[in-house]
Amino acid sequence: MNLPSDFSQRTHELLGDNDYRQLEDALQDEAPVSIRVNSAKCDREVKGERVPWSANGIYLAERPTFTFDPLFHAGCYYVQEASSMFVEQVLKTYVSSPVVMLDLCAAPGGKSTAARAVLPDGSLLVANEVMRNRVQILAENLIKWGNTEVVVTNNDPSDFAALPGMFDVVLTDVPCSGEGMFRKDAVAVEEWSADNVQICRQRQRRILADVWTALKPGGLLIYSTCTYNREEDEDNVAWIARELGAEVLEVPVRSEWNITGNLTEADFPVYRFLPHKTKGEGFFLAVLRKDTEGGEEERTGDYLKEHAGCRKDKKKGGREKQQVMTVPKEVKDWLQHPEDYQFEVKGTGIVAFPKKHCETYALLQQVLKVIHAGVTLGELKGKDIVPDHSLAMTIAMRQGKFLQAELSYEQAIGYLRKEAVVLDSSIPRGYILLTYKKIPLGFAKNIGNRANNLYPQEWRIRSGYLPDVLSICLLYTSDAADEAR
């Protein structure tokens, strides 16, 4: 790898000669492969070294073809770079009761799924992505993760100014110059320049200033980048504390994790992951608590009432008008504890959303573009209600409401390619929940001689390649591999 000369000079000055040489050497090595297991869905033993700052993070000995593991598509794990799993450590340290949290720059969903896994029950996660072409993969990954206390939005950071004091926690994994991704992304190396570092720093400050109002006084800001330089890291943390008003907080870490602290003359705590010291990619994180001086922020509900212009005009393409319809009890009973949900019909979709968050959700809908919320139970088609894939993925689905059919590995891959499904002749007609290793993959409608594949078209596996099943099973214990033979 040929590093930009300006990058080498600047990083050498930041790290010193010895650390910089070790970093250069580390960037020539293969990046480690790691996953984070979804313990709410899967209790299968996964082979590998544990990521020390993550309860369910695991390093793999080599990179399997994840695309061809049905359990990957079922949301049993997320392929995530190990350093960024440190967000979990922050939330475990500072969040012990239910919160409303915003992940501002969330796609593709690694930190959102990590946050959702450790947030206390009763917390609401709002995962936002400003880029329209990236928000769908964010929604897909959160749907697969299976938690219903989630809202996915597609908004500019400035839009959140209309929600003052709404969030207890805001995570800003801001767009950056990408120095920490050099060994995984050749484009990041090609596009790097000292000028771009300055552009990124200014963009990051704009994003932070835009969202600051939405963080309640005393709320927690998690600031992170995947870059090394001080301009986007320590200098921005100092700017937040000084200009926006915040205290920098410490996160307990173990010395054997080899996380690097502040590399400037300042003494506030920060957490920098360097590839030659920690097993992961380049990553930087700091935690700040917003000052409470000056009184409470104006409540969001009062703000919206007084600033009606912030609301979307429902007659001009704003929030879709809900149909007046009673959702059948048998559909509500597709969920565990249906009494805990509010049910509504949006277009042709039947959506369930946790009642405890309905007031917050109503406020979000007034100012944000909501892509996904709660769980979509099904779609109205004439007199029929077709169960939605979101229902198959949620951990809130009531077991036993649908007949199940277990698929072989080859059948599961065929289903995920959206190929025709052939079921055993003993299986009755109707909607069938298809499983692999007893984990739900999705629905099919059995019509007798064949079954209509209801897997989402846009999520299908497009490759026709079929690997040796044992190459997939390197993820799991020997018992799991034996099952797959």
Task: Report residues per predicted region.
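Polybasic, low-complexity RNA-engagement segments
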Residues: 1-42, 291-478
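Conserved SAM-binding loop of SAM-dependent methyltransferases across substrates and taxa
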Residues: 108-120
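Helix-to-beta-strand junctions that scaffold the AdoMet/dcAdoMet cofactor pocket
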Residues: 120, 215-216
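S-adenosyl-L-methionine
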Residues: 139-162
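A short acidic, Gly/Pro-enriched loop at the edge of an enzyme's catalytic core
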Residues: 162-169
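Class I S-adenosyl-L-methionine
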Residues: 167, 220-223, 227-351
